[in-house]
From Swiss-Prot:
EC number, UniProt record: 3.1.26.3
Every RNase III domain range: 5-134
Catalytic residue positions: 51, 123
Superkingdom of origin: Bacteria
InterPro entries: dsRBD_dom, RNase_III, RNase_III_dom, RNase_III_sf
Protein known as: Ribonuclease 3
Pfam families, A to Z: dsrm (PF00035), Ribonucleas_3_3 (PF14622)
Gene name of the record: rnc
Length: 232
């Protein structure tokens, strides 16, 4: 944990008073289960707390940043920011993937690169930071790690391409829109999906992503950028 403490101190000016709390935040259930006799705590409870404070602070930021956006748009943007893939990306940006304590089986199966585990650890860290410091310190960290990406428009880009495409195509009546996986490559824990979107059986766009949902969004974006003429 000393290397993690160095990263936190040098990059984020964070020094934990309770080192055990920090260690718990990076302890996956698989590691705790393999060391039951030591009664090691895992990070699920801290994840619960971190999720709550993250939702609160992102909601507050969006409410103040976009005074004219309706509730529905704010909710969609927040969902994009706090989704699993985003949280895993934040964890990687912070080098957190290097410090998660995993059981041997989970490590062997590629758990260190799994979005679910990384996202959970990121939220657990926020929960630990809240308990060790206060909500102001969590906010400072979020504004350093997450908010610059929000303001750069990273989450606006794919907010609603599927809905936008549907609205464009159905302006003159219902049409059958379907997404299908063309191929998937890579190991189970790090797959890449290729998806195409079809209208009345005709392929109108293709996209790639590390989840089916992201690939579908990219396919919809591809179709929108081609224009309606190619879709009908």
């Amino acid at each position: 944990m000393k290397e993690l403490q160095t990263v936190l101190k040098n990059h984020f000016a964070i020094e934990f008073a309770d080192k055990n709390l920090l260690e718990t935040a990076f302890t996956h259930t698989s590691y705790a289960n393999e060391h039951r006799l030591l009664k090691i705590s895992h990070n699920e409870r801290l994840e619960f707390l971190g999720d709550a404070v993250l939702q609160l602070l992102i909601s507050e930021y969006l409410y103040k940043k976009y005074p004219k956006k309706p509730e529905g748009d704010l909710s969609k943007l927040r969902a994009m920011i706090v989704r699993e893939e985003s949280l895993a990306g934040f964890a990687r940006d912070c080098q957190f993937n290097q410090f998660i304590k995993l059981g041997k089986g989970e490590e062997k199966s590629g758990g260190r690169n799994r979005d679910t585990i990384l996202g959970d650890a990121f939220e657990a860290f926020l929960g630990a930071l809240l308990l060790d410091k206060d909500v102001a310190k969590v906010k400072e960290f979020i504004y350093q790690v997450i908010i610059p990406k929000v303001e750069a428009g990273e989450f606006e880009m794919i907010t609603d391409y599927k809905t936008h495409l549907q609205e464009l195509l159905q302006v003159n009546g219902d049409v059958a829109i379907r997404y299908q996986v063309i191929s998937e490559t890579g190991p189970a824990h790090d797959k890449v999906f290729d998806v195409e979107v079809l209208v009345e059986g005709k392929s109108i766009g293709q996209g790639q992503g590390r989840s089916k949902k992201l690939a579908e969004q990219e396919a919809a974006k591809n179709a929108v950028e081609k224009g309606l003429d190619s879709c009908i």
